[in-house]
């Protein structure tokens, strides 16, 4: 396709060959093919991850369960097994605020 345009005394000619025209027309098909390939690759990766997850879960469920490790004794020997959580009490009367 040849188009001639006159602007004042200059003539501009635009030549589009059949190869360029075919390339412009097929660029949409190329993009669509790339998108399809990417979707196929992502699908395959998800299927592989699902199979791996299923295999690891069955392996964890089938392996013998080891008993829990023994609980370490209390640090204070005089506690005699009765452990009470440490408590902190807050008394506002004991708080000294510096005045300026």
Swiss-Prot record:
Residues 50-100 are cytoplasmic. Found in the peripheral nervous system (PNS) Schwann cells (at protein level). Expressed in the PNS, primarily limited to Schwann cells. Residues 1-28 are extracellular. Glycosylated. It is found in: Cell membrane. The chain crosses the membrane at residues 29-49. GO terms for molecular function: structural constituent of myelin sheath. Induction: Up-regulated in Schwann cells by EGR2 during nerve development and after nerve injury. InterPro entries: NCMAP. The keyword Membrane applies. Residues 58-100 are annotated as: Disordered. One of its GO terms (cellular component) is Schmidt-Lanterman incisure. Keywords: Cell membrane, Glycoprotein, Membrane, Transmembrane, Transmembrane helix. Its main location: membrane. One of its GO terms (biological process) is peripheral nervous system myelin formation. Plays a role in myelin formation. This is Noncompact myelin-associated protein.
């Amino acid at each position: 396709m040849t188009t001639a345009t006159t602007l004042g005394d200059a003539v501009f000619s635009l030549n589009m060959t059949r190869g360029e025209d075919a390339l412009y027309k097929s660029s949409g098909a190329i993009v669509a093919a790339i998108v399809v390939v990417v979707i196929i690759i992502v699908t395959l990766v998800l299927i592989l991850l699902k199979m791996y997850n299923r295999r690891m879960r069955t392996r964890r469920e089938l392996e013998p369960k080891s008993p829990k490790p023994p609980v370490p004794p209390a640090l204070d020997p005089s506690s005699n097994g009765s452990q009470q959580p440490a408590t902190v009490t807050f008394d506002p009367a004991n708080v000294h605020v510096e005045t300026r």
